Each structure stands twice: as C-alpha cells, then as structure tokens.
C-alpha cells in the first residue's frame, strides 16, 4: 500500500490508517480472491516517518486485517528493507506471512538472513510462508532462497535508473530502441524476455518448475 516517497506526502500521517482501511475494503469488494497485501514496502528505520517504521508496523497490519467483508479478511504482511534487516518480534507476531527483501545480499548473506527469521520465537510459534518478494537479478540468490525453503522475487530495475545495489543500473543510459529495453522497473518497460539477464532467470525458473 505505502512507500516512503508517497507516504511522506500524507498530512496528517494518521491518514495511513484510513487509507489502509479503505483500500482493503475496496479489494474485498472487488471480487478478486487471490490477494495478498504488503501494507508498507520496506518499512525500515531509515524512513524517518514513525507511523510506517518497524515499531508501528503491527498497527498497520492489524488495520488491514481488521477490515472484513462477510467475515473474510486479506492475508497481510509488511516487507523489510534489504541487507540484514529482519522484522521485529511484534511485527512477526502480527503478520500472516513474512516478506524480507534480499537487495544487496550475497547468497550466503541471504541464507543467513532467512535463517535468522526462522530462528525467532515468533516464527517458531507460528511458522508461515517466507516470500523474498524483492531481491535482484542474480540467480544464485534464487538458489539460496530455495535452499532455505523460501520463494524469491526477481527484481530487474533496468538501465537508466539511479538505483544501485549489487547491480549498477547507472552503468549506461536507458536504451533508445524498444526491443533493447532492459529491466521491468525503469520506464518505458518492455515486458518481453528480451535480454540475457531476463533469460537467465526465466530459463532457471523453467527448469525448477519443469515448465514447458
């Protein structure tokens, strides 16, 4: 629902709760059934926006879960930042599934991060799916997540962006020809599997899933 750049425009900040309730109600009434909610993307201390920082995450989650239609609610999480950050115990207790981001992690660091989540008391009390829904383009990180029994998210920014972690997307400008456009994040986007980086991921995924 929220990310730091747009959330900081909310005045007063408490509008977060009203928005979370209204959007959840709209989703419940939409008729779509397979909906998972990430209440705030990469909630982290660096937000400098207390209402969506780790200490308040449980309230955001409970706002979403407390919005129901005919007794039905939506499964909800809040994703962490990349690097070493994992959710607090209260955060883990509140959410239905866990979404640690793997941006910036080497494979061994990602495995360690996922193990740290699974070693928490909150996770042991109630094991749940762990979904690394944002990481990188590196297939070795996919392998690391799978080795820990977790799913993994291919995050392919595309050249011409200011974003950089293990991959430097500032290495050259945005491609000028549509057929050559890299990534799935930097606009304009070519949704085809048209670059070696994209092909490496989808070919590995095809092998894992025994796809046709």
Predicted regions and their residues:
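Alpha-helix initiation/capping motif
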Residues: 12, 138, 195-198
């Amino acid at each position: 629902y929220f990310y730091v750049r747009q959330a900081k425009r909310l005045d007063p900040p408490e509008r977060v709760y009203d928005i979370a309730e209204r959007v959840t109600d709209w989703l419940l009434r939409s008729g779509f059934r397979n909906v998972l909610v990430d209440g705030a993307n990469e909630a982290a201390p660096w937000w400098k926006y207390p209402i969506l920082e780790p200490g308040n995450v449980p309230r955001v989650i409970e706002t979403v879960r407390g919005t129901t239609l005919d007794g039905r609610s939506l499964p909800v999480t809040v994703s962490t930042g990349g690097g070493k950050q994992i959710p607090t115990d209260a955060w883990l207790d509140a959410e239905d599934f866990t979404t640690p981001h793997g941006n910036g992690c080497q494979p061994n660091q990602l495995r360690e991060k996922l193990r740290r989540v699974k070693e928490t008391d909150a996770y042991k009390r109630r094991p749940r799916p762990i979904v690394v829904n944002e990481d990188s383009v590196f297939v070795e990180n996919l392998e690391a997540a799978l080795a820990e029994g977790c799913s993994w998210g291919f995050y392919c920014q595309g050249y011409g962006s200011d974003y950089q972690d293990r991959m430097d997307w500032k290495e050259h400008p945005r491609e000028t020809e549509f057929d050559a456009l890299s990534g799935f994040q930097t606009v304009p986007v070519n949704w085809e599997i048209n670059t070696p980086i994209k092909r490496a991921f989808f070919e590995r995924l095809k092998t894992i899933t025994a796809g046709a």
